[in-house]
Amino acid sequence: MVMAQKLKEAEITEQDSLLLTRNLLRIAIFNISYIRGLFPEKYFNDKSVPALDMKIKKLMPMDAESRRLIDWMEKGVYDALQRKYLKTLMFSICETVDGPMIEEYSFSFSYSDSDSQDVMMNINRTGNKKNGGIFNSTADITPNQMRSSACKMVRTLVQLMRTLDKMPDERTIVMKLLYYDDVTPPDYEPPFFRGCTEDEAQYVWTKNPLRMEIGNVNSKHLVLTLKVKSVLDPCEDENDDMQDDGKSIGPDSVHDDQPSDSDSEISQTQENQFIVAPVEKQDDDDGEVDEDDNTQDPAENEQQLARVKDWINSRHLDTLELTDILANFPDISIVLSEEIMDQLVTEGVLSKTGKDMYIKKRDKTPESEFTFVKEEADGQISPGKSVAPEDYLYMKALYHSLPMKYVTITKLHNMLDGEANQTAVRKLMDRMTQEGYVEASSNRRLGKRVIHSSLTEKKLNEVRKVLATDDMDVDVTETINKTNGPDAKVTADVSTCGGIHSIGSDFTRTKGRSGGMQQNGSVLSEQTISKAGNTPISNKAQPAASRESFAVHGGAVKEAETVNCSQASQDRRGRKTSMVREPILQYSKRQKSQAN
């Protein structure tokens, strides 16, 4: 009892956090390799992990391939992890080196600020804590909670893999790394890895994979999150009807992206109730018990409806999907979630745009959606009026898409210079489809066809008036030549270039000074960027600025500021990615000889 109390009160150091995360990665990769049959069974030894109270299969270096995988982990991944460069590790099984993909295990990492010990995460808590915030790791994380979260994640991963179809005999094992670009040196490559081209960084899926969020472990100084994609889902007929955003197979299969206070309340009996499909009752954050799908409790249903409705109203995005509800309310069953969405459609809160896809209804009509466009054109915009970030990003998407014949998510994502991830870009495309600018059907090779009409032309002209040329792609050399002399220096707040800001992501901006630029404008000196810390999340959140916040000296936007913003976009375009130098090629003939 005394030892247990000491363990509970033990201080979690940064080294403890790093070692726990390293061990979790080992356990996950070894379990994946064993259960998915990537190596013969004789390559694994049983190993006990007292800290997690579980037994695992440890991969031994029996041949060149198994040694190579161990080296990737121990010498490559760990090097990037301890330097706090590593953002995402993607452990992939493909048909060939170039694809298509079979399965992908994505491990994401968030690091704490060394001063405040706060782990910055994009938090959408479940339950009634709908506003989210910063998770204070110093106050909330205990060793017991870490152990519970780790067990939960590993057991969920194991149960998922046991439900998947058998891995094909011929496959290729690849590992890729993404980095926090604001702290990672451009020339950095961990051992056994090399820089990969933009084409090599792309991921090709022949069909829509099953996508699941397995869980996360907050070890106070570092947060590890695991997500899985696979085309070997025995329920693929259901997945074929789902959109490319990916779906989970049940509400209990999607765990919180972020740690919640409920992690510390997990009892010993609950610890063994980690399931892949919703077949058992589990307590949620409020101590409520999920009812069986066949049992209807009107009072409970009304309460869940109110929770979901409040959460939807608090969202800054208008579009959402059924999977958003399942991910943020894992205690609500699929059946009840569908009923709630149907009820919200009936009440006029939502409008259905497709299978399991919805958009919040607005009071204004589509024709008045961009009324501020006309007001600005007529000089009626008040100085303090700003454009909402999501509308600003949508206008940029329209600006790039409407002149084209066909548009794809990848093409639009590249044109936006990384200001939105592919999920956000997909939602922008859905919105364009809903508003009649893009056809709903898609050509596999060309993408979705843009509808060219008088309405499209009118919308494009309106968008151009708002964005003007200073907020879009700028010829850097031409802009430099227009500055008020070569020594002109203007301090520019580029923390919200593109109208979007995200904590701990590659959207985050810092203040820069334009004076350090070279004459040709093609290179921005490193001295122009001031960094507040040496971790990916050391820059605290700043309020998002409107277009007017870039105006100086009576509202005239200096061209040098525009160069800074454009240069930041160019930097985002070159997102650093590494892949292993020598992938592991596995063929049936080789595997049979090794198994004998």
Swiss-Prot record:
Region Disordered, residue ranges: 235-303, 562-596
Ranges of biased composition (kind: Acidic residues): 282-295
Location(s), subcellular: Chromosome; Nucleus
Domain SWIRM, first and last residues per copy: 351-449
Gene Ontology CC entries for this record: chromatin; chromosome; condensed nuclear chromosome; nucleoplasm
Gene Ontology biological process terms in this record: chiasma assembly; homologous chromosome pairing at meiosis; synaptonemal complex assembly
Tagged with keyword Nucleus: yes
Domain HORMA: 15-228
Keywords: Chromosome, Meiosis, Nucleus
Gene ablation phenotype (knockout): Failure of the pairing of homologous chromosomes during meiosis (asynapsis or non-homologous synapsis) in both male and female gametophytes.
Protein role: Required for normal meiosis in male and female gametophytes. Plays a crucial role in coordinating the activity of DMC1, a key member of the homologous recombination machinery. Acts at the interface between the developing chromosome axes and the recombination machinery to ensure DMC1-mediated interhomolog recombination.
PANTHER family given in the database record: HORMA DOMAIN-CONTAINING PROTEIN 1 (PTHR48225), MEIOSIS-SPECIFIC PROTEIN HOP1 (PTHR48225:SF7)
Subunit structure: Interacts with ASY3.
Record's protein name: Meiosis-specific protein ASY1
Organism: Arabidopsis thaliana
